[in-house]
């Protein structure tokens, strides 16, 4: 919907005040219509978008017309029926739209012409249209209704009644109704929306004015049936507050509210001298007086029946009662009583200060952020700052209607109850009964859901304070509203209503009421009001505040149309009370008297006019205060904006907490439901809960809808993306086409220039042409002149361009100079930076090398530690294993005495056996020597056996010894490395500590140097203190030195004693070591002897076997062969015996001697030639054997010599190793002594001496390293010089090679050029690829951001809709709770209510 800017609103407000002061009533009819025309042109948006029209600047727009509006008087009986019907429909979530309510200007003749007009076609058509409309509602076809067409049709239907009313009024304002009708139609382009989601804006923290006017209608319609409660009990249900979230369209002006409500319009009264219309001036024109006369005639006729229901049904009661209640509540408002006949605020009312006590309930204007959206800072200001003086009775209904939380309903119930006490006789006992019922229901709800009551305590406190104020009010003030209710006149002219369902017309048929009772009540009222409003002093408020009150005056006055007073709410806008001036009171009295006598007294009329002039002067005086109000407006506005922002943030935080708690509770509830469902299945085997199934179906349905929405968004995004691509392609094509066209145009331009050039310098052969061609000649001359002008222009351009060129050259030179300067500066800075970078690089390299060395050192240290740990682990394992073996041996063997006995016996047996074996060996050797004294194999065998055994045993022993010594040496080396490593660690630690100490000392020195000039003035006193302190320190130092010396002496004695003990231990250790060595040698000798014994036994067994075998062979040979054979066998045997000298032992010898067999052919004679051959053969064999023996002897001698040399070498090595081990052992002992001394001495002197010794050692080591490094540095410098020379030579050779290649052939040059071009092309290609990649990434990012924004927008929309659904469900739950409570208390519910409850449950 189109919006008015602030400037337009200010202009309209100025016009309105001008009209009030200048009596320009006719001109005022034209002014509001102009913006409406503009709005009608602008308002092309559909009805569902137009509902949120008031959200931009926070103001209510200018839909409020300041023209006179026509009013209709409706009978009460039809109102009650209509109210009940529409209220029940609204509570079920159905939007109720009557054909009557859709009209913008519904003008029906008043009760004066009720008899003349009769029932009329209009009423019958209304009934038919209502029936059709409700039938469509039941069928669910309300969304297809075109309400704008219905408005036009109904306006055309009502034109007849317009004419009737105008005729009856004497054509006082003929053009006014038409203008208003026109303006009203322009102001009401909106139609009702079925979608409650569009109607509610859940992020508004403050309730707007129009939002307040809507809820006020429902309770008042419900209270319209109170006069009939004694006869009908069903009228009580009108008190049930049913918040119709479908109709809660925010920021829509009053006429839009009037449309969807089918109730009769309540008529605010007009009494006294005040005019009912918003644009009427207070001048004394004849048209105004005639209109007043007609109004009082209507009053006289409409109040003919003055029964109690009639009085309560009159609209005057509501505003009067609201004024009286406002007097009882606020001390300041007691001076300003609003007259029931006018919606305009008085000057006193506009000047009222914004105070806390002028409001009703605190905290009610602060709605949570998630529920309603702030319309704007200005409207929030006006909403939170308006002084409200409307009755709390209807305020309680309004709060119940607006509030989405139970605590607000609790507030409203308490207020409703207090209001009921203030009303007095107009409030029957049934209302108190309903109040108690509401209190019980709301207590239960607040006890069940305490998380939804962040403002409960505050509201209850304020409501209790208001209740106590009500109870303390005097009884006379309570009775005033009932008296005033009898003097409520309906007016013939219609103006925007603030009562409940004020826009709906009813087709009732009530009788005109008598005017007599009205006059008596009116006189009483005016006489009382005169006494109360004499000493009213205007107080300045903000201009914006008063402007909003006047602009929204027709919308915000809610005098209860049906027996109910207007609501009084803190923070929500309502019509402020308007105090009556004495002139107004006298004007009322005068008017009533003139109406009583009707044309009787002329003087009263003159007095009335005089008082009207006085009122006009007061209004002009009030206009002067507007300037003062403007000054304070900006400050108030800023303060209110700040407060609104802080409240918004507070509400956002509270809402966030509530959402979190709600989410947790929902999760808990779902878990509880699942457990209860499982228990039910286990116990009864029932199926799942149908309610949860329905909820699941609803949730699935919502999820499907969301998915379809997302699919639609995705399709739309794809379509838009394809469109973007098409547009990009089209753009490229257009660029190519334009480029081609430009080229064509350039070519055409060149050709035209050439043609023009030719035309300029054509030969002057044209002179010889015939005179008929004079016209063409003149044309050519004109072209020539034009060309010359063009030429002149071009020459000027050339001059100008030359000048520009010179200027640009000057600038270019300047830029070049600047460039050269910048280059020089850059070179200078780069040189400095390069030098700094080099220094930093060198320092970095040094640091890196230092850290690498330290890292390497740590790595080596870790390796050593790992080795030590492995060795320690192995040693532990070995010790464990040995312990187990020892335990096993102990268990196997008995006591140590038995073991020693057994060992001694075994040793004795072994010794005897060894002696026996040695004796046998000696005997065998002696036998062999005796038998074969010169036998070479026996000698060699004896020598080899003896030598081998000795040699092998000694070699094994030496090898084992060498291995052991090597292992000890490696262990010593590792220990030495460890000690060196520990020394290095200590050195590094000391170095770090020394550096830290130096830094600390330097810092302290610098600090003291900085503090020195400051402390010079008190140096003398400090010096004395320091001297005394120094003396004390010296004494303490001497004492400590003495103590340390004593400790050193004691430690020296302890050290000597320990050294003595250490030496004793070392001697014992050395003796034990020698004993262990001797034991090891004895064991080795024993093992060697055992081995030799075993070898001798094996050799004896072999010899016995060979002897037996030879004997067998001999027997075989002797038995078979002849004497020749025997000789050969003897020779063979001799040979064998020579080869095996050991084969003859004692057993074999005894066998050869004693066991000879007899052979007869043994000693027979043989041939001499055979004997000679045998001798020759034996001699030759003997010579060979002798040669072989000599050879073996030489070899054995060489082996003996070699063995001796190796033994000497092994002995020398062993002696050297033993010497080194002794030296290492001594060093280790010294080290142990040093460690012991360090550990056992706590003296600082010994520690420092040790450190000094270590430092000296390290210094020597480092000096050696420095000397080595100096020598290496010299060689390094020489190598660097050599390397530089070689590098120069290499570069020179490469350049020569390159030049030779280039100058070699042209193909090579071409090849080199191609290589350069290829490199350039590759570089360009890479750059283009990078640019393309950047462009692609940018486009992707843009598309992704747009998609993300779109998705976030739709997500927010979905969240808003879900919150609105939750709100609506909570409202329905509260409504159903109220209805259930009514059922429980026995209230009879009609059929429509039951239908409504069933529909709500289905929802």
Curated annotation (Swiss-Prot):
For bias kind Basic and acidic residues, which ranges apply? 176-189, 206-220, 522-532, 567-581
Q: Does the keyword Coiled coil apply?
A: yes
> Which InterPro entries does UniProt cross-reference here?
CEP162-like
- Residues in a coiled coil are 610-1120, 1170-1205, 1234-1385
Write down which residues bear the modification named Phosphoserine: 156, 159, 468
Is Secreted one of the keywords?
A: no
* Comp. bias regions, Basic residues: 481-496
What biological-process GO terms show up in the record? cilium assembly
Q: Output compositional bias ranges, type Acidic residues.
A: 192-204
* Biased composition regions of type Polar residues, renumbered to the chain: 26-35, 449-466, 504-517
Q: Which GO terms describe its cellular component?
A: axonemal microtubule; centriolar satellite; centriole; centrosome; ciliary basal body; cytosol; Golgi apparatus; nucleoplasm
Q: Where in the cell is it found?
A: Cytoplasm, Cytoskeleton, Microtubule organizing center, Centrosome, Centriole; Cytoplasm, Cytoskeleton, Spindle; Nucleus
Cite the entry's keywords alphabetically. Answer: Cilium biogenesis/degradation, Coiled coil, Cytoplasm, Cytoskeleton, Microtubule, Nucleus, Phosphoprotein
Q: What does this protein do?
A: Required to promote assembly of the transition zone in primary cilia. Acts by specifically recognizing and binding the axonemal microtubule. Localizes to the distal ends of centrioles before ciliogenesis and directly binds to axonemal microtubule, thereby promoting and restricting transition zone formation specifically at the cilia base. Required to mediate CEP290 association with microtubules.
Quaternary structure and partners: Interacts with alpha-tubulin. Interacts with CPNE4. Interacts with CEP290.
Q: Which PANTHER family match?
A: CENTROSOMAL PROTEIN OF 162 KDA (PTHR34031:SF1)
* Name by which UniProt lists this protein: Centrosomal protein of 162 kDa
Q: Which organism is it from?
A: Rattus norvegicus
């Amino acid at each position: 919907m189109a919006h008015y800017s602030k400037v337009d609103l200010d202009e309209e407000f100025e016009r309105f005040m001008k009209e009030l002061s200048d009596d320009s009533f006719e001109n005022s009819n034209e002014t509001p219509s102009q913006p409406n025309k503009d709005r009608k042109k602008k308002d092309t948006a559909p009805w569902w978008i137009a509902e949120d029209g008031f959200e931009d600047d926070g103001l209510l727009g200018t839909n409020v017309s300041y023209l006179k509006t026509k009013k209709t008087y409706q009978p009460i009986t039809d109102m009650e029926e209509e109210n009940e019907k529409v209220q029940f429909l609204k509570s079920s979530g159905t939007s109720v739209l009557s054909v009557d309510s859709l009209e913008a200007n519904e003008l029906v003749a008043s009760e004066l012409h009720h008899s003349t007009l009769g029932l009329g076609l209009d009423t019958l058509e209304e009934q038919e249209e209502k029936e059709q409309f409700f039938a469509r509602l039941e069928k669910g076809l309300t969304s297809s209704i075109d309400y704008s067409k219905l408005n036009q049709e109904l306006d055309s239907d009502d034109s007849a009644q317009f004419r009737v009313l105008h005729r009856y009024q004497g054509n006082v304002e003929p053009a006014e109704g038409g203008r208003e009708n026109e303006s009203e139609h322009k102001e009401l382009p909106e139609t009702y929306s079925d979608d409650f989601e569009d109607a509610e804006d859940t992020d508004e923290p403050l309730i707007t004015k129009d939002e307040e006017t809507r809820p006020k209608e429902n309770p008042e319609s419900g209270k319209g049936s109170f006069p009939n409660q004694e006869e009908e009990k069903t009228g009580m249900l009108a008190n049930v507050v049913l918040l119709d979230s479908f109709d809660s369209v925010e920021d829509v002006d009053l006429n839009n509210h009037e449309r969807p409500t089918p109730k009769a319009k309540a008529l605010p009264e007009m009494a006294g001298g005040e005019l009912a219309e918003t644009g009427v001036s207070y001048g004394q024109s004849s048209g105004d007086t005639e209109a007043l006369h007609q109004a009082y005639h209507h009053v006289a006729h409409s109040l003919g029946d003055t029964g109690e229901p009639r009085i309560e049904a009159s609209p005057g009661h509501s505003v009067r009662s609201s004024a009286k209640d406002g007097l009882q509540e606020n001390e300041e408002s007691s001076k300003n009583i609003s007259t029931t006949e006018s919606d305009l605020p008085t000057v006193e009312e506009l000047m009222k200060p914004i105070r806390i006590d002028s409001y009703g309930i605190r905290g009610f204007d602060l709605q949570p952020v998630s529920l309603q959206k702030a319309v704007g800072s200005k409207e929030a200001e006006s909403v939170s700052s308006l002084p409200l003086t409307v009755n709390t009775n209807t305020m309680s209904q309004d709060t119940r209607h607006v509030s989405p939380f139970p605590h607000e309903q609790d507030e409203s119930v308490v207020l409703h109850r207090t209001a009921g006490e203030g009303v007095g006789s107009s409030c029957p006992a049934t209302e108190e009964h309903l109040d108690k019922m509401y209190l019980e229901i709301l207590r239960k709800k607040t006890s069940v859901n305490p998380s939804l009551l962040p403002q409960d305590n505050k509201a209850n406190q304020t409501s209790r304070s208001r209740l106590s104020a009500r109870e303390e009010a005097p009884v006379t003030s309570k009775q005033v509203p009932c008296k005033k209710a009898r003097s409520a006149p309906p007016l013939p002219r219609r103006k925007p209503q603030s009562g409940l369902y004020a826009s709906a017309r009813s087709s009732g048929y009530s009788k005109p009421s008598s005017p007599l009772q009205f006059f008596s009540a009116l006189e009483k009222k005016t006489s009382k009001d005169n006494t109360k409003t004499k000493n009213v002093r205007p107080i300045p408020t903000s201009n914006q505040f008063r402007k909003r009150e006047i602009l929204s005056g027709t919308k915000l006055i809610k005098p209860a149309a049906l027996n109910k007073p207007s609501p009084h709410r803190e923070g929500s806008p309502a019509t402020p009370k308007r105090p009556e001036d004495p002139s107004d009171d006298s004007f009322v009295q005068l008017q009533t008297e003139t109406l009583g006598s009707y044309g009787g007294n002329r003087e009263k009329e003159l007095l009335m006019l005089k008082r009207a002039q006085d009122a006009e002067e007061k209004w002009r005086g009030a206009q002067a205060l507007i300037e003062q109000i403007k000054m304070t407006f900006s400050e108030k506005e800023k303060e209110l904006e700040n407060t609104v922002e802080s409240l918004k943030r507070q509400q956002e935080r509270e809402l966030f907490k509530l959402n979190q708690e709600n989410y947790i509770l929902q999760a808990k509830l779902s878990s509880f439901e699942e457990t209860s469902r499982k228990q039910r299945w286990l116990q009864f085997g029932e199926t799942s809960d149908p309610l949860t199934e329905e909820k699941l179906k609803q949730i699935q349905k919502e999820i499907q809808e969301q998915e379809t929405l997302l699919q639609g968004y995705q399709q739309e995004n794809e379509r838009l993306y394809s469109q973007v691509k098409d547009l990009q392609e089209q753009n490229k094509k257009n660029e190519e086409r334009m480029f081609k066209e430009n080229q064509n145009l350039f070519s055409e331009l060149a050709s035209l220039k050439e043609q023009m050039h030719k035309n300029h310098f054509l030969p002057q052969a044209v002179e010889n042409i015939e005179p008929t061609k004079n016209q063409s000649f003149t044309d050519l001359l004109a072209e020539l002149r034009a060309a010359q002008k063009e030429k002149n222009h071009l020459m000027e351009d050339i001059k100008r361009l030359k000048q520009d060129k010179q200027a640009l050259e000057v600038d270019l030179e300047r830029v070049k100079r600047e460039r050269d300067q910048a280059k020089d500066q850059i070179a200078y800075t780069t040189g400095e930076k390069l030098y700094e970078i080099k220094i930093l690089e060198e320092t970095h390299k040094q640091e890196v090398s230092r850290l690498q060395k330290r890292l390497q050192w740590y790595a080596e240290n870790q390796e050593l530690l790992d080795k030590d740990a492995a060795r320690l682990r192995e040693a532990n394992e070995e010790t464990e294993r040995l312990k187990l073996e020892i335990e096993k041996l102990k268990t196997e063997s008995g006591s140590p005495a038995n073991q020693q006995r057994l060992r001694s016996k075994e040793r004795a047996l072994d010794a005897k056996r060894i002696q026996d074996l040695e004796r046998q060996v000696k005997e065998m050797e002696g036998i062999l020597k005796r038998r074969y004294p010169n036998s070479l194999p026996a000698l060699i065998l004896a020598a080899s056996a003896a030598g081998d055994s000795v040699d092998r045993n000694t070699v094994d022993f030496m090898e084992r010894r060498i291995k052991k010594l090597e292992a000890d040496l490696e262990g010593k080396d590792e220990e030495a490395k460890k000690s060196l490593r520990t020394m290095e660690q200590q050195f590094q630690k000391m170095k770090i500590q020394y550096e830290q100490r130096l830094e600390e000392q330097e810092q302290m020195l610098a600090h003291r140097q900085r503090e020195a000039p400051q402390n010079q003035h008190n140096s003398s006193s400090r010096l004395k203190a320091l001297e005394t302190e120094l003396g004390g320190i010296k004494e303490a130092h001497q004492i400590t030195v003495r103590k340390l010396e004593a400790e050193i002496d004691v430690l020296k004695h302890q050290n000597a004693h320990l050294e003595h003990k250490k030496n004793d231990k070392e001697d014992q250790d050395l003796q034990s070591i020698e004993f262990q060595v001797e034991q090891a040698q004895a064991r080795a000798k024993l093992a060697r002897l055992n081995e030799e014994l075993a070898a001798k036994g094996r050799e004896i067994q072999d010899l016995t076997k060979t002897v037996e075998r030879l004997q067998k062979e001999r027997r075989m040979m002797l038995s078979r062969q002849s004497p020749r054979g025997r000789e050969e066998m003897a020779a063979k045997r001799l040979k064998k015996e020579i080869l095996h000298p050991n084969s003859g032992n004692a057993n074999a010898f005894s066998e050869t001697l004693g066991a000879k067999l007899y052979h007869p052919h043994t000693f027979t004679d043989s041939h001499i030639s055979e004997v000679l051959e045998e001798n020759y053969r034996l001699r030759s064999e003997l010579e060979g054997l002798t040669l072989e023996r000599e050879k073996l002897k030489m070899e054995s001698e060489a082996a003996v010599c070699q063995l001796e040399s190796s033994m000497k070498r092994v002995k020398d090595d062993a002696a050297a190793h033993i010497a080194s081990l002794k030296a290492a052992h001594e060093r280790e002992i010294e080290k142990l002594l040093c460690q012991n001394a360090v550990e056992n001495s706590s003296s600082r002197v010994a520690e420092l001496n040790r450190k000094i010794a270590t430092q000296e050692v390290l210094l020597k080591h480092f000096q050696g390293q420095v000397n080595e490094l100096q020598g290496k540095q010299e060689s390094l410098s020489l190598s660097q010089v050599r390397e530089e020379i070689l590098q120069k030579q290499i570069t020179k050779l490469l350049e020569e090679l390159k030049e030779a290649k280039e100058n070699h052939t042209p193909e090579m040059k071409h090849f080199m050029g191609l290589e350069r071009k290829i490199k350039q092309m590759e570089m360009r290609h890479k750059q283009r690829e990078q640019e393309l990649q950047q462009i692609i990434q940018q486009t992707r990012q843009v598309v992704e951001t747009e998609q993300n924004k779109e998705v976030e927008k739709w997500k927010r929309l979905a969240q808003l809709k879900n919150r609105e659904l939750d709100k609506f469900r909570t409202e329905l739950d509260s409504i159903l709770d109220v209805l259930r409570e009514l059922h429980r208390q026995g209230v009879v519910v009609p059929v429509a209510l039951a239908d409504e409850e069933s529909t709500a449950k289905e929802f």
